[in-house]
Amino acid sequence: MSQADADITPFFADDNEGEGPVENGVGSPLPEDEEEESPSGVTDRRAIMTVIVLCYINLLNYMDRFTVAGVLPDIEHFFGIGDGTSGLLQTVFICSYMFLAPLFGYLGDRYNRKLIMCVGIFFWSVVTLASSFIGKDHFWALLLTRGLVGVGEASYSTIAPTIIADLFVKEKRTNMLSIFYFAIPVGSGMGYIVGSKVDTVAKDWHWALRVTPGLGLLAVFLLMLVVQEPKRGAIEAHPEHTLHRTSWLADMKALCRNPSFILSTFGFTAVAFVTGSLALWAPAFLFRAGVFTGVKQPCFKAPCDDSDSLIFGAITVVTGILGVASGVQASKLLRTRTPRADPLVCAAGLLLAAPFLYLSIMFAQASTVATYVFIFLGETFLSMNWAIVADILLYVVIPTRRSTAEAFQIVLSHLLGDAISPYLIGVVSDSIKESNSYMWEFRSLQMSLLLCSFVAVAGGAFFLATAVFIEKDRDLAENYVPSDDAPIVVPRSGRSTKVSVSSVLI
């Protein structure tokens, strides 16, 4: 049995063992009335249901991540902390998420992805619930639990896109990825809205962290009931080719020599830097602008004014949907004219977002309406990247390396992006601030947020560079021909040793 036909495996089984119906009369035949399976081993109807479940979990993922941002003023007031310290809440989460991604990427390329996600999401739900019972003298415990939440999210984010890639190809894959990535802005916006409203109703920010755990347990149930593990690469593999696993080191060497993957990852890092900064600090910045101009009252007692979180959350939802949809459609139209369409659309999105983000920050004091209009435009252009970047990764990397590539991209984009940006913005704000007056609280955060516009321009440059290599790298991935894995003799430690071809090839 080929490896492509043997991917529905027990959790700790090797991929050389499979289960389910097989060809040539071996195994149990499918019932005659059952829908015909695709090469992935999953029926079309089950594939659609799988994408729906994965979208639900992705939405829940981002909803949980940004619930904290929706109640950040209350958390700062409750623990008596400043900008630099509160910025750590996002940083510790992203750091654990980032460092665990390679582990789950390695496991996702070799073991049953469905069960890995089930275990990770269950753990994430339990830890999130535990974080909602922390008292005011134990801020370190909140940091610890927010860090542990990254375990569950790393188990999901590195694996889910590769499952979609094994269910669909070409334009249908792009469409499904766009649906999947709609959940990012929608979930983020819902995090702001649900977090702030639950805080207002319950008059305690802790309750905002108790919404997603129950929904997470429902996600585990849906994963077990609905999702079926597809066969890796079977839907797009050439019939005469069998894809072999190579070592993790060989995978990493191959990825590092893939310029389209590396450059698009750096471009996506810029997106992560900007979105991470805005996600945590935009509502707080808008609130401080209102206090400075006298439109809002300062927060002396929780719950604080949540109108900015609600409006920013609604903007995030709408701009995310518009941005992802417009990015995908622009890419489809441009593909008829140039095979470099995807990185060019990503570059345009970042380069157009930069001036509008700059204007939104500078107009915060003068006009609230103008500020929201510029935020709307900036976030719309910024959101054009999500589905397209994922599609680029999937078509320039071969199937047996995709989870590892997802993990590598997560590590780099978070290490230099949203792991550092919230903390960096907070530290710069604290260093600029000359006093604790309302004016300096606003001005210092305003100046530090201007970094986002310049990072967006740098990201656009990386995507323009990606366009130079995209044709060649896509062709190499689509026409990848693995060698026969029969043993060959190589010199090792002064003697001849038989090893498999895949262990020495990159």
From Swiss-Prot:
Top-level taxon of origin: Eukaryota
TM helices/strands, residue ranges: 52-71, 87-107, 115-135, 149-169, 176-196, 207-227, 266-286, 310-330, 344-364, 373-393, 408-428, 450-470
Tissue expression as described in the entry: Expressed in yolk cells.
InterPro entries: MFS, MFS_dom, MFS_spinster-like, MFS_trans_sf
Positions with biased composition (Low complexity): 21-30
Protein purpose: Mediates the rate-limiting, proton-dependent, lysosomal efflux of lysophospholipids. Selective for zwitterionic headgroups such as lysophosphatidylcholine (LPC) and lysophosphatidylethanolamine (LPE). Essential player in lysosomal homeostasis. Critical for embryogenesis. Involved in the regulation of developmental senescence.
UniProt protein name: Protein spinster homolog 1
Organism: Danio rerio (Zebrafish)
Gene name linked to the record: spns1
